[in-house]
C-alpha cells in the first residue's frame, strides 16, 4: 500500500462493502498484524493450508500414472482439516451515492475513483460487464480514452474494469486529471458515456471488435502450458467446471448488444456507487 496509488482499491472497497470481508485488506491492517500472535497464524495455517482446501494442477508432457504416484508420495501424509464452511455475510445494496476522500502521501496527481457492486464471477452478467469495460477503456480507440485523453485532453489516463470475484464483483472506474482539470469534470465526462451505453446500443462493428479483442486475450492467456494450468486451476476452484476452458469463448461470443445496454442500466446507476476523491497528502 506504500506504492503510489497502492491503496486505491482499498479506498473503494472499504466504502462499498460494510459487511462482507471484501471491504478489508487480504492480510489485514497494520493494527491487525500487530495484534496477532504466532498461535493465530498457526491456527490459520492449520485450517486453510490443507490438501482438502487446495487445487493442484500438473500440466505438460507427463506420465499420468507416474504423476499420480508422485502426488501420493509427496502429499498423502499431509493431514486434512475440517471442511472450510464459508458463511459470509450478504452485502446490503447501495441505494444512494457514497462520497469519500482518501489521502495518499505518495502521489502528486489526484485520482477520481468510482466503484459499483456487481455480480459474482460465475455469472453471465459478470462477463457482460467485462465486455463493457473493454468497450469503455481498453485501448486508444475505446470511447473513454478517445474522448477524455485524445480528443478533449482532460485526462492523463482513464480505465474501467470489472473485478469479478467469488461472491461479488467490483466495477471500478479510474481517471487521472490533466493539469487543472477537476475530478468533478472527469466524473461528468464518464457519466455522459455511461448514460449513452445505458440508452443506446453499441454498433455491430464495435461488438465484433470487442469479441475479437476478448478472443485474442483468451488465446494469449492460454498459449503456454503455464497459462493453461492456471486457467484450469481457476475454473475448478471458482467455477467447479474445468470444461469452461473449452466453452468460455462461446459464452462471450453469444453476448448481445442488448445485454450490454441492459446490464449497464441495471448496475451502473449513480445511486448505486461510491465516489472517492483520491488526493495527495
Predicted regions and their residues:
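Non-catalytic, conformational "gating/processing" segments within enzyme and secreted inhibitor domains
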Residues: 5, 38-74, 272
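Short beta-strand/turn micro-motifs at beta-sheet edges
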Residues: 42-46, 99-102, 157-163
